[in-house]
Regions:
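PLP-dependent enzyme catalytic core of the Aspartate aminotransferase-like
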Residues: 2, 121-122, 130-131, 152, ...
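N-terminal "arm"/small-domain region of PLP-dependent enzymes with the aminotransferase-like
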Residues: 2-63, 71-72
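Short amphipathic alpha-helical segments
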Residues: 54, 80, 284, 288, ...
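Conserved C-terminal alpha-helix-loop-beta "cap" of PLP-dependent enzymes
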Residues: 277, 299, 307, 311-408, ...
Length: 440
């Protein structure tokens, strides 16, 4: 049998982490609907709790179904380990809290999902963690100027939501590493099929597995994947939570116990997940595994449809601008070809010439596109970010994040593209009538 490390992406998305059940011989991954697990002996129990060996203790911390999902995500991203959580928001929260605490500072791009912006700006502030937002993530000097002695990490999205801008991962990673901190990236829109951030210098990847990885709009989940390359033990003073004895875990030092490649992800599991409890249900983990098994097939169709619709919208007189890095007119077109040669995903946004009222009429007039707060479904979706996903932000913060009053965001599904165009055409006609009436 070929070695798993030699498998291509399409094989890994089906087989990594899974094997026939040793007792029942069932081929599909079972749903292990249990709270806890029998120890072989007192010594076995003690070893598990002391991190002397790995295994299942309690489903709040780990579950065999969850483990298959984690191994598969780690394989697809090329990481050393993964932790799956109850939501993408939990993943972003854990990714920061795992190495930052009261009195610390983080640096983030401002071109991020509105929920993440709100988490960083307001909730982390209540916990004593300060954030500096980089308004132009393409400027390495702005990242460099934001560094402080108490900075613990850089954060950005590989493909920004909703600007669909491409992060120069290598450049930002270099600035982060020169400052002694890791780069954490959200790879939700791209998925590892389009961009593998570890190959470009990123250290930690987070996902809303809810979106394109799960792909069917049925299940909430999040994930953190550790690239295993950041040398925590060489930054003892900056990351004492990983390098010094943890009094809440038998005085263990995570870097000493499991080494730099696994210290971050093990700490997130046995300390944060143990204490905060954002565990994913076994049924949810199983649902997400089913989605991942068709990831490459779906993403190819998603990208094909999105590219065609972006080009179609870009050629229309009633559309003021289109944000999609797969268009030659995009300022990130060159970076898209460098980092995402197979395509830049299925999320795009555009501004109607009629402004906010035209945008509202457009959304209300669609029938095939579903008006809801999600992306990454096989079904095509639409939303008005300024009044929904980014509504918690001030008008100034919205503009910094690339959200204008009349912006409309599409998540393009895998339906027939001509049917999607017909639906968009009818809605654009309705929006045009509103604009003409306003001018009359």
């Amino acid at each position: 049998m070929s070695a798993p490390e030699t498998w291509r992406f399409e094989t890994k998305q089906i087989h990594s982490g899974a094997a026939p059940d040793p007792v029942t011989k069932a081929r599909a991954t079972p749903i292990y609907q249990t709270t806890s697990y029998v120890f072989d002996s007192a010594d076995h129990a003690a070893n598990l709790f002391a991190l002397a060996e790995f295994g299942n203790i309690y489903t709040r911390i780990q579950n065999p179904t969850q483990d298959v999902l984690e191994q598969r995500l780690a394989a697809l991203e090329g990481g050393t380990g993964a932790l799956v959580l109850a939501s993408g928001q939990a993943a972003s929260t854990f990714a920061v809290l795992n190495i930052a605490q009261a009195g610390d500072h983080i640096v983030s791009s401002s071109s991020i999902y509105g929920g993440t912006y709100n988490l960083f700006k307001y909730t982390l502030a209540k916990l004593g963690i300060e954030v500096t937002f980089v308004e132009n993530q393409d400027d390495p000097e702005e990242w460099r100027r934001a560094l402080r002695p108490n900075t613990k990490l850089f954060f950005a999205e590989t493909i920004g939501n909703p600007q669909i801008n491409i992060l120069d991962i290598r450049t930002v990673a270099d600035v982060a590493h020169q400052g002694g901190v890791p780069l954490i990236v959200d790879n939700t829109i791209a998925t590892p099929y389009l961009i593998r951030p570890f190959e470009h210098g990123a250290d930690i990847v987070v996902h809303s597995v809810t979106k394109f990885l799960g792909g069917h709009g049925t299940t909430i989940g999040g994930a953190i994947i550790d690239g295993g390359s950041f040398e925590w033990s060489k930054n003892v003073e900056r990351f004492p939570g990983l390098t010094e004895p943890d009094p809440s875990y038998h005085g263990a030092s995570y870097t000493a116990a499991v080494g730099d490649p696994l210290a971050y992800i093990i700490k997130a599991r046995v300390q944060l997940l143990r204490d905060l409890g954002s565990a994913i249900a076994p049924q949810s983990a199983w649902n997400l595994i089913q989605g991942i098994e068709t990831l490459s097939l779906r993403i190819e169709r998603h990208v094909q449809n999105a590219q065609e619709i972006a080009e179609w919208l870009d050629g229309r007189d009633d559309v003021a601008s289109v944000n999609y890095s797969g268009l030659p007119s995009s300022p990130w077109y060159a970076k898209a070809n460098e980092y995402a040669p197979k395509g830049v995903g299925a999320v795009l946004s555009f501004e109607l010439k009629g402004g906010v009222e035209a945008g509202r009429e457009f959304v209300n007039s669609l029938s095939l596109f579903s008006h809801l707060a999600n992306i990454g479904d096989v079904r095509s979706l639409v939303i008005h970010p300024a009044s929904t996903t980014h509504a918690q932000l001030t008008p100034e913060q919205q503009l910094t994040a690339g959200v204008t009053p009349g912006l409309v965001r599409l998540s393009v599904g895998i339906e027939n593209v001509d049917d999607l165009k017909a639906d968009l055409d009818e809605a654009l006609a309705a929006a045009r009538r509103v604009s003409e009436a306003a001018r009359a």
